[in-house]
Swiss-Prot record:
The keyword Acetylation applies. GO terms for cellular component: membrane; monolayer-surrounded lipid storage body. It comes from Bromus secalinus. Belongs to the oleosin family. The chain crosses the membrane at residues 69-89, 101-121. The keyword Repeat applies. The modification N-acetylalanine is found at A2. It comes from the Eukaryota. PROSITE patterns: OLEOSINS. This is Oleosin 16 kDa. InterPro entries: Oleosin. Its main location: other. One of its GO terms (biological process) is post-embryonic development.
Amino acid sequence: MADHHRDRGVLGGGALGERGSHGGYGYTGDHGGYGGDDEQHQQKQPVMMCALKAATAATAGGSMLVLSGLILAGTVIALTVATPVLVIFSPVLVPAAISMALMSAGFVTSGGLGVAAVSVFSWMYKYLAGKHPPGADQLDHAKARLASKARDIKDAAQIRVEQAQGA
């Protein structure tokens, strides 16, 4: 019966479910139990973990190295096969590529300007609906300054017209 409990880690004086100093359950660090010397166990674990980490890293690194070599070889073969075709068709492909680039730039520009127009219309709707969008205060201030300057110019023009008629 004692051997049965020793295998379960109960013999060391701790109860099942009680964590010992080595991080396991049941073994409390008593050297009379199943684990042998606790310090020796702690030293072996990091060495084994380092070896396991090194093996995992070597496996992952090796497979990535093999994959990168295969991709490089495939790229070289593809360029070797495609170069004569590109040289033969370059009088057609270069203008086609330029046309595609210009059309793509046109579509992107058109889309960007469309988004800008929608955002401006949205801002104007919010402003006219009285929802006070960002920048509405600046617009109101600029509108007031412009109206003030227009009044000043109108008054100055009226004064000059009256002076010209009176003279």
